[in-house]
Each structure stands twice: as C-alpha cells, then as structure tokens.
C-alpha cells in the first residue's frame, strides 16, 4: 500500500510515477474523497466538542436547580447528528482505503521506462547454449519417451495444466528442490521454514494478492476465508506481520519449499503444452525482511543467490531488469532470471526477484525500531524464487539430453540420487 501521507501531500508526483507503469491514477476522485473526508472530520470534531460542552452544562444547570430537559434534548440531538457524521466519515474513509488498496507500488528511479516485456533491459548472460547434432526434443517428448512424465494421466486425474511424475524424473524433481534448499540454507544464510499451504485473506491482503487478484487464487469452500497459497512468499512474508523488530533481528532471511497453486485465469491459450504454466507447481522461495537502508543491497544479493543455483547446474541463463510496465503489483524493482530452453530456442523465466520496499510492510504493519528512534518505522520486504522447481526440471531435461534420448544428471545433483549419472530411455 502506498503512503497515505504522500498521496495527500503530493498526488501529482504519485500520478506521474504510476504513469511510468502505464497506470492512470484518477486524481480527481481521490482529491474529492480527501476533501469530503476532511469536511466530515471537521464536522465530527465540531459536533463532538459541542456535545461535550452541552453535557458539562447539564451538570451546572442541575446544580443551580434549572430545568435540564432542553439541554438533554439538545445533547441527544447532537449525539444523533454525531453518529450520522461518523457513519458518513467511515463510508468515505472505506472508499478511500479501497481506492488506495488498488494502487500498485511506485517504481524505483533505476527501473527502465517501458510498458511490457519488450522494453525489459538485459543485464548479462551466463553460459553458452549448447549445440546439438541431433533433433532436439522438448521435455514433453522426452518425458513421453521415458514414460515417467505423464500429462494425459494428470488430465484424467484432475484436468489440464497438471503433471504426473514417476520414477527417476520424480526423483530428479525432488533432488532439485533439496539441492536448492541446501544451497540457500548452507551457503546463503536462509532459515528453512515449513509453512501452511493454506492461508487466510489477511495474509493475502498483506502481500498484495487481495483484494485485486482474487481471480488468480484457489479459494476453499467453507465458513472460513481460506485460500491455497499461490507462492510461499505469502506465508513467509506474513511472519513479519504486526511485528516490531530490533536492528539485531534483521535481516530476517527465510526460505521454504512448497507447492504453489494458481488458477492462471489470465493465461488462457498460453503455454498449454508441458510444464511451463501449471495450476500446481513446486518452488523454493526466498524472503528477506530488512532495514530500509539495506534493501537494494539485499536485492542484489538475492539475485546472486538465485543465479548460483543455475550456475551450479550449468544451465545457460540471462538476467533482465523489468521495465516499469512489466513489474508485478507490489514491486518497486524486479529482476527476472530466464533459463535457456533448446526446444524453444529462447530464454524463459525461472525466477523473479523483487524489492517491494515498504509497500507490503505498510499493509502488514511490519516495523522495526532503532534505539535512537521514538517511533518504529516500516521495514522493507523482498522476495524471489530460488528457484521454480518444475521449470528447472524441464530445463535440465532439455539442456542435458543426449542423442540416444538419455539425460545426463548434473554433477551437483548426483549425490541426491545415490550417484546416478544418467536417466536412460
């Protein structure tokens, strides 16, 4: 959520920065709501003061033996008018809050100008895409050849955009997740967490999925407002909700391996083949809760933590800085890591690392207090994939395929697979 003080003090600046995202801010509506809010606030305070004055007069009149009924009637009337003014003020405030909750984060000054992925800026590439002297198969054909990756069975069990993995491919998928967790905890200093895969609406509001993106979520039926998590970012980041940290407790670095569930409501017809876009997929998530003064250093570190996974697996990739118009709702700056897929002869997203600054923290009231400060300040929150396990699996299958259809297991994963070096057809 954006800073209400900034919205009230410099709305044109907010509108200008949001325009970089391609977002048109209805300044007239916000100005009208704020004007009405101030009027009602003033009226409420006036009526409150007037009622207090009349209430005191009742005691004085009673002590002097005067008829207090007219004063009682006046106080009663003032009370009714005050209640009505408070109700109108609450309605206007709720309308203001709803409008502000729908506003995306402001892009950082270093974010490139642009409206979509065509305007993203490549930072660098690592590794050289391999050359093959045979016809390259995609992960769907490779899985069908093995019989260990079955989309037809998944469609029978559930529907489209699901997968059944068996045997060595299921084991390779698990090995990837374990390797990622070990890398993030042992080398990069994250604390491993086990979190609920079901969260409430307050958690999703805290990280920004609600109220605007409810259609992208799987909501459970029942008396509670429960949802399947779209990413472990939601429970991990909300660990900081309504907390006040000391400087010594930060940075808080958390990681978790979870399934993620997304309706993909806006992805009809896109990436319908294979594991690129699934309703259920696994991901190792990284979250950092940090002092605002260090958040952009943390962003660079997190990018390195994600890159280290791809480098260890020897998978070619590139890093891009997302332009303002292509960033997620809560992000102030985002890097995407894109892995090379030989079957598509292009790079595809495998990790997104974002600094949300205080956007989520304001919603969650996640704060810190320096010893020299009287009031606590909002922390900054960052999140990123370290990495998407399913997409990493298909990248390994495609980049490590051999002419005979076998898959060479990356060396760093062999210890997780009892020394197996190759998956044979």
From Swiss-Prot:
Report any Pfam family annotated for this entry: tRNA-synt_2b
List GO molecular-function terms, semicolon-separated.
ATP binding; serine-tRNA ligase activity
What keywords sit in the KW lines? Aminoacyl-tRNA synthetase, ATP-binding, Cytoplasm, Ligase, Nucleotide-binding, Protein biosynthesis
Q: In which pathway does it act?
A: Aminoacyl-tRNA biosynthesis; selenocysteinyl-tRNA(Sec) biosynthesis; L-seryl-tRNA(Sec) from L-serine and tRNA(Sec): step 1/1
* Chief location: cytoplasm
Q: Which residues bind ATP?
A: 262-264, 349-352
Q: Which InterPro entries match?
A: aa-tRNA-synt_IIb (IPR002314), aa-tRNA-synth_II (IPR006195), aa-tRNA-synth_II/BPL/LPL (IPR045864), Ser-tRNA-ligase_type_1 (IPR002317), Ser-tRNA-synth_1_N (IPR015866), SerRS_1_N_sf (IPR042103), SerRS_core (IPR033729), tRNA-bd_arm (IPR010978)
Q: Where in the cell is it found?
A: Cytoplasm
Query: Any one Gene Ontology biological process term?
Result: seryl-tRNA aminoacylation
- Where L-serine is bound, by residue? 231-233, 285, 385
Annotated Gene Ontology cellular component terms: cytoplasm
* SUPFAM superfamilies according to UniProt: Class II aaRS and biotin synthetases, tRNA-binding arm
Question: Which residues form each disulfide bond in the chain?
Answer: none
Domain of life, source organism: Bacteria
Q: Which reaction does it catalyse?
A: tRNA(Ser) + L-serine + ATP = L-seryl-tRNA(Ser) + AMP + diphosphate + H(+); tRNA(Sec) + L-serine + ATP = L-seryl-tRNA(Sec) + AMP + diphosphate + H(+)
What are its E.C. numbers?
6.1.1.11
Q: Report the family membership.
A: Belongs to the class-II aminoacyl-tRNA synthetase family. Type-1 seryl-tRNA synthetase subfamily.
Q: How does it assemble?
A: Homodimer. The tRNA molecule binds across the dimer.
Protein's job = Catalyzes the attachment of serine to tRNA(Ser). Is also able to aminoacylate tRNA(Sec) with serine, to form the misacylated tRNA L-seryl-tRNA(Sec), which will be further converted into selenocysteinyl-tRNA(Sec).
The entry's free-text remark on domains says:
Consists of two distinct domains, a catalytic core and a N-terminal extension that is involved in tRNA binding.
Q: What is this protein called?
A: Serine--tRNA ligase
Q: Which organism is it from?
A: Chromohalobacter salexigens (strain ATCC BAA-138 / DSM 3043 / CIP 106854 / NCIMB 13768 / 1H11)
Q: Which gene encodes it?
A: serS
